[in-house]
């Protein structure tokens, strides 16, 4: 299957290159490198809580090819595609044969602009895509990410901003089931691998672009998840040892961004609320996936994110992400969960192409159980890195970095790392690029 996927992707690429009318848009991303720790191989932990710099040990890439297929009288068709590649970088012979390397079909869609009467700027799309993801780069987290196969319309102008509406499929797989409760228990038992997959559809509505004052802009939206069992799947799902009936769930997001021209600083404030199967995202740094492995009928949660960058001088700049989240009853035995995370990255640019980073991150997480007990987790990371870069701004790529990192799992995680240690030191080299 994976070989067929790669062959299909190559064929699509060659077909687009053979089309003489329009140029091919080529973009992508990759990261890779090598590292080692003071106790065995490089070890990573909690990068969405403590930061990603010097805390990644994989090889990951995305190759995106797109092409305009039609342009006439204000109407256009645009084809977009993307494949991803992942491996743990452990050796040279990483192939799909033994799942050492993984290939994924991430995007394959068609976008039609100018076809809706009265809405010349609106784009209607169908296929598979990354749908308007909202990213926090230094912790590698997408806090608003409803992606998959679907269809929608975007850039429907209204006032200062525009609406977007989408229907996206994001099924849950490999759920626990009790086939004895199925209307067709015999078939369920013999074909459990099909009965334990649950169809989940998302309806997503957003409005972006309202500017409440000079230098500010906003975005608001709701993502509504709808589990969709077949009749033969009703009453068969289990979670945490008991019957589980997945409920419709929502996640509401509002964000305010502001550019402080005097400081040349971008700052963002994000407020989110979610319930039932989506509530756990508020304390797991998730972006909207539905939890079908926990009893969460009464779950509710919220999250506050503050992120931004601040140039101090021509040579010094800072970037940070602060997250606080709280969720109640996201599993059968949990009363509440709280998360507090803080990550900051500082940069000193020696020249246009030479810069040094210092990144520090810390988090605390607490589970309060219905039995009256508590479980606490914490961690810290400190990274010093020197980089060869294409320019001074912090997010300029390509970049090649030499790093040393100290990770501490906290008193609660004394056996977290190799040799039953609570901390580790990593050093290595990593390359990263996007284009």
From Swiss-Prot:
It comes from the Bacteria. GO terms for molecular function: maltodextrin transmembrane transporter activity; maltose transporting porin activity. One of its GO terms (biological process) is monoatomic ion transport. The keyword Membrane applies. Its main location: membrane. Residues 1-23 form the signal peptide. Pfam families: LamB (PF02264). It catalyses: beta-maltose(in) = beta-maltose(out). The record marks 29, 60, 434 as: Greasy slide, important in sugar transport. It is a multi-pass membrane protein. One of its GO terms (cellular component) is cell outer membrane. InterPro entries: G_neg_Bact_CarbUptk_Porin (IPR050286), Maltoporin (IPR023738), Porin_LamB (IPR003192), Porin_LamB_sf (IPR036998). Keywords: Cell outer membrane, Ion transport, Membrane, Porin, Signal, Sugar transport, Transmembrane, Transmembrane beta strand, Transport. Belongs to the porin LamB (TC 1.B.3) family. Involved in the transport of maltose and maltodextrins. Homotrimer formed of three 18-stranded antiparallel beta-barrels, containing three independent channels. This is Maltoporin.
């Amino acid at each position: 299957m994976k070989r067929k996927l790669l062959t299909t992707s190559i064929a699509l690429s060659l077909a687009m290159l053979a089309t003489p009318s329009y140029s091919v848009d080529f973009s992508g991303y990759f990261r890779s490198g090598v590292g080692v720790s003071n106790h065995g191989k490089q070890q990573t932990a909690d990068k969405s809580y403590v930061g990603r710099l010097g805390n990644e040990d994989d090889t990951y890439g995305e190759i995106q090819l797109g092409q305009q297929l039609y342009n006439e009288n204000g109407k256009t068709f645009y084809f977009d595609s993307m494949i991803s590649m992942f491996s743990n970088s452990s050796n040279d012979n990483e192939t799909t044969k033994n799942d050492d390397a993984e290939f994924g079909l991430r995007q394959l869609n068609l976008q039609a602009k100018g076809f809706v009467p009265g809405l010349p700027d609106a784009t209607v799309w169908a296929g598979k895509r990354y749908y308007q993801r909202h990213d926090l780069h230094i912790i590698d987290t997408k806090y608003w990410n409803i992606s998959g196969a679907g269809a929608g319309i975007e850039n429907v102008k209204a006032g200062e901003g525009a609406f977007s509406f989408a229907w996206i499929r994001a099924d849950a797989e490999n759920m626990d089931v009790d086939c004895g409760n199925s209307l067709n228990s015999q078939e369920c038992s013999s074909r459990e691998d099909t009965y334990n997959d649950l169809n989940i559809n998302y309806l997503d509505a957003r409005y972006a672009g309202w500017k409440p004052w000079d230098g500010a802009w906003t975005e608001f939206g709701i993502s509504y998840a709808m589990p969709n069992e077949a009749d033969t799947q009703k009453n068969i799902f289990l979670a945490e040892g008991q019957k589980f009936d997945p409920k419709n769930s929502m996640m509401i997001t509002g964000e305010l961004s502001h550019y402080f021209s005097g400081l040349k600083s971008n700052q963002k404030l994000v407020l989110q609320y979610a319930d039932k199967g989506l509530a756990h995202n508020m304390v797991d740094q998730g972006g909207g996936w539905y939890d079908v492995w926990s009893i969460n009928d009464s779950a509710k949660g919220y999250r506050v994110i503050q992120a931004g960058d601040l140039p101090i001088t021509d040579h010094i700049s800072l970037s940070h992400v602060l997250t606080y989240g709280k969720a109640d009853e996201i599993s059968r035995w949990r009363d509440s969960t709280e998360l507090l995370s803080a990550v900051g990255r500082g940069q000193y640019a020696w020249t246009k192409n030479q810069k040094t980073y210092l990144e520090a991150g810390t988090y605390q997480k607490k589970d309060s159980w219905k039995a009256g007990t508590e479980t606490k987790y914490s961690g810290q990371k400190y990274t010093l890195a020197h980089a060869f870069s294409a320019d001074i701004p912090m997010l300029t790529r390509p970049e090649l970095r030499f790093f040393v990192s100290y990770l501490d799992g906290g008193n609660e995680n004394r056996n977290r790392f190799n040799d039953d240690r609570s901390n580790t030191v990593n050093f290595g080299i990593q390359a990263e690029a996007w284009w």
